[in-house]
């Protein structure tokens, strides 16, 4: 019973509150200030046994120019055309306004299924607005309180027959496919490519950066349509907007985030909410694209953003935007690489890609870099290979001997992926200097081809149980002396 429902209406009638109610999470920013929502935000909605896609839209306003409000209105009209059903919300406490009448007329012409909802209609305060709503000519209004969850049953009974109609149509149009889905799912764990993106498990990408770096423009170019609001004004995006799409054959879910300024500059309450929303999007993501402006790259805030993504353990790709504006490309590229290596040593080897979100140049390279970063982030190395490598590393450069006691490295294993995490069993783990840890981490990157991805390395003492104690490994002779084995 899958269909798409767009929630539309004037600013501040409760669209985002209802969106959050339907998706069961606080995904959209909510505030009593009009115009909080500026982009189209999609979510997986659930209403009793109905499952559908819901779109939260910017408020409809009576403007048609190229102002910010005008572009917001055009995005909303696009959502109306995309949706199977429109839920037109008015404010029950305010009643029907002249703008409501104009937009009701527009919706009648643009969409076959329009449901009229009177929000904030709890108690007697909403009675007059609910009665007045009949004058819009959209049929019987459904009384709702998005904030308190009232009227959801009534909305369900209106949506159910519409959903059944779409389900019957989809079943009639669906091709017959001779595939045992259960067998495919059962083989997923045995598949070495199990981490590859699929429609059910798309690659999660977050695009982050300072305000006006071109994040929304880049995403619009990637997905091939104007889904996100763009313009010269810094800070247009306020939410972390998520869009599902396919990019050069790769199923993706891509997050656009609010621009992240220095904390001292974040004074507006909405902007604080937006930045926190962007940080949450990083935690949802698998690959984070840090987008820089070629004219002012590697500002202090860029470095903080990249460091945050690495600290969160996400695969990182650095993209330098507005490359079409750069005249001396070779000299600038050499300068960017030098700055990257010097200012972000924790991301040594991470891909640096030049792009133009405006023209689309460089998106092929960006796509390839994201897929490679995701593959490395999911990489698993066998214990035998790790211990063979560890023996060679110790032989080339033995651990220090603090207080005259040599630190002995017993064995090593990988304990997790996403990002790769390793444990080394050793004597005196607390005395292992950071310089030797970096030596091992850099060696892992170089030997196993894992540039740029965060690597977690933990030292554990001999008191911890060795899960490989009873197992026999065929190890090189030079490693046996370090593992305490007898030939």
From Swiss-Prot:
Chain ranges of the KH-like domain: 379-463
CDD domains linked: EngA1, EngA2
- Record-annotated EngA-type G domain positions: 3-167, 203-378
- Residues reported to bind GTP 1: 9-16, 56-60, 119-122
Where does the chain cross the membrane?
Answer: none
Q: Which Gene3D superfamilies match?
A: 3.30.300.20, P-loop containing nucleotide triphosphate hydrolases
Q: Where is the composition biased (Basic residues)?
A: 471-487
Entry's SUPFAM superfamilies?
Answer: P-loop containing nucleoside triphosphate hydrolases
Residues that bind GTP 2: 209-216, 256-260, 321-324
User: Quick one: where's region Disordered?
Assistant: 459-487
Q: Which InterPro entries does the annotation name?
A: G_ENGA, GTP-bd, GTPase_Der, KH_dom-like, KH_dom-like_a/b, P-loop_NTPase, Small_GTP-bd
Biological process annotations from GO: ribosome biogenesis
Q: Which PROSITE patterns match?
A: G_ENGA
State the similarity comment.
Belongs to the TRAFAC class TrmE-Era-EngA-EngB-Septin-like GTPase superfamily. EngA (Der) GTPase family.
Query: Its quaternary structure?
Result: Associates with the 50S ribosomal subunit.
Write down what this protein is called: GTPase Der
């Amino acid at each position: 019973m899958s269909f798409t429902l767009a929630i539309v209406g004037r600013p501040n009638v409760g669209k985002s509150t209802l969106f959050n109610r339907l998706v069961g999470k606080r995904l959209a920013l909510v505030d009593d200030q009009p115009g909080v929502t500026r982009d189209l935000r999609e979510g997986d909605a659930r209403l009793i046994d109905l499952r559908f896609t819901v779109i939260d839209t910017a408020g409809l306003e009576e403007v048609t120019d190229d102002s910010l409000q005008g572009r917001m209105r055009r995005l909303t009209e696009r959502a109306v055309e995309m949706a199977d059903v429109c839920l037109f919300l008015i404010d029950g406490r305010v009643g029907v306004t002249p703008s409501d009448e104009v937009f009701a007329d527009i919706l009648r012409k643009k969409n076959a299924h329009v449901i009229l909802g009177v929000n904030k209609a709890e108690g007697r305060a909403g009675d007059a607005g609910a009665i007045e709503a009949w004058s819009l000519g959209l049929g019987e209004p459904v009384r709702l309180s998005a904030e308190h969850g009232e009227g959801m049953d009534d909305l369900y009974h209106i949506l159910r027959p519409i959903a059944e109609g779409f389900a019957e149509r989809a079943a009639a149009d669906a091709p017959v496919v001779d595939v045992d889905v259960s067998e495919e799912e059962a083989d997923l764990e045995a598949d070495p490519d199990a981490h590859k993106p699929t429609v059910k498990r798309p690659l999660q990408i977050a695009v982050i950066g300072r305000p006006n770096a071109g994040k929304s423009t880049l995403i619009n170019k990637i997905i091939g349509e104007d889904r996100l609001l763009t313009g010269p004004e810094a800070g247009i995006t306020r939410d972390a907007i998520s869009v599902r799409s396919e990019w050069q054959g790769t199923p993706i879910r891509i997050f656009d985030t609010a621009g992240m300024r220095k904390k001292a500059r974040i004074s507006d309450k909405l902007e604080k909410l937006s930045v926190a929303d962007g940080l949450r999007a990083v935690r949802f993501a698998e690959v984070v694209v840090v987008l820089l402006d070629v004219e002012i790259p590697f500002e202090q805030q860029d470095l903080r953003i990249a460091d945050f993504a690495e600290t969160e353990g996400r695969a990182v790709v650095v993209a330098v935007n507005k490359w079409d504006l750069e005249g001396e490309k070779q000299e600038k590229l050499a300068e960017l690489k030098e700055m990257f290596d010097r200012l972000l040593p924790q991301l040594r080897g991470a891909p640096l890609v030049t792009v133009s979100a405006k023209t689309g140049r460089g998106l092929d390279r960006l796509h390839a870099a994201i897929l490679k970063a995701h593959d490395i982030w999911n990489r698993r190395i066998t214990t035998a290979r790790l211990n063979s490598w560890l023996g060679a590393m110790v032989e080339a450069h033995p651990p220090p001997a603090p207080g005259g006691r040599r630190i002995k490295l017993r064995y090593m294993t990988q304990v997790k992926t996403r990002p790769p995490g390793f444990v080394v069993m050793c004597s005196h783990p607390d005395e292992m200097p950071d310089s030797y840890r970096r030596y091992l981490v850099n060696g892992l990157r170089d030997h196993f081809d894992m540039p740029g991805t965060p690597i977690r390395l933990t030292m554990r003492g001999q008191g911890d149980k060795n899960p490989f104690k009873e197992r026999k490994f065929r190890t090189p002779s030079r490693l046996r002396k370090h593992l305490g084995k007898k030939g």
